[in-house]
């Protein structure tokens, strides 16, 4: 499913690995050209709360705006996913909508967070 979207330049996927253990995948992050759903990620529990996903989000958000030249990034997240919300808040994103969404583990109340390229670049100055 991912490879055709990558070939069409509609999705971009990366794995997260520690420099000290480059053969071990500890997480994943992706970007996609979908309405209200441009970025998603997961990180294994042992590596959470260390700033690793915050760092990865910085890099891929730069890529979204500076390399791919999109004007807005929207990231959905389950309301219960407080850690994911904190990353969006740290990045200067704002909550723009709530809705129910389907996830691998079921349907849950969700939030959609947004930041524009202009806002992103202003934060980096």
Question: Each PLM stretch: what is its role?
Answer:
Residues 1-46, 63, 67, 73, ...:
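GNAT-family acyltransferases
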């Amino acid at each position: 499913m991912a490879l055709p979207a990558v070939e069409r330049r509609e999705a971009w996927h990366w794995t997260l690995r520690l420099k000290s253990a480059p053969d071990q995948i500890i997480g994943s992050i992706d970007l996609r050209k979908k309405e209200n759903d441009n970025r998603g990620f997961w990180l294994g529990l042992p590596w959470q709360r260390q700033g690793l996903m915050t760092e990865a989000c910085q890099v891929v958000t730069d890529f979204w705006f500076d390399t791919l030249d999109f004007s807005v990034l929207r990231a959905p997240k389950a309301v219960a996913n407080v850690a994911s919300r904190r990353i969006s808040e740290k990045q200067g994103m704002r909550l723009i909508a709530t809705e129910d969404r389907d996830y691998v583990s079921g349907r849950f109340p969700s939030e959609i967070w947004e930041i524009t390229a202009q806002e992103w670049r202003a934060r980096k100055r």
